[in-house]
């Protein structure tokens, strides 16, 4: 009885949330999902790319995460760091993440500033530039992230080795942050080529 009540209440609370969601596909194939919520004059804008560690292969593991960092390092219009500075100057915040299957970029900003986010995302979707100095900095940051999150934590190292063994013939064996050996040999061209895909 309690199980059925829980299921009913769960459905009852989830169904109204779905009612305000609209999904459409643009001519270029990009899927747009909009969920309206007018409780506050704020918008959360997210762009997700179907790229992550499961698309990588030995020799370039970690390239999706490095590219995530490079997406903040300038375009034909913007200098390194300008993207986040523009969002912050308009009262917003931004960040990004890489997973096995997706890489996402998100901003939270006043709803009357949504156009700024969309213009910035459209720019970096097509116009990221790769500067060797910026690449070297970000590669070092990702390597340090790996040391901090995995190499210096026995439990994390254990789970990484477990996944590598359990998913031996699956791309899920590749850690999102990449193998340190691959990160040490990764070149800017690898990230630039990954971006062009």
Locations of the language-model features?
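Bacterial N-terminal signal peptides
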Residues: 4-16
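Acidic/histidine-enriched segments that form metal/cofactor-coordinating
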Residues: 49, 75-76, 82-194
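Intrinsically disordered, low-complexity segments enriched in polar/charged residues with Gly/Pro
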Residues: 9-12, 21, 34, 170-172
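Active-site-proximal flexible loops/turns
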Residues: 10, 72, 152
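Hydrophobic side chains within alpha-helical segments
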Residues: 7, 68-71, 141, 148
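His/Glu-rich zincin catalytic helix
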Residues: 17-84, 106-109, 115-125, 192-197
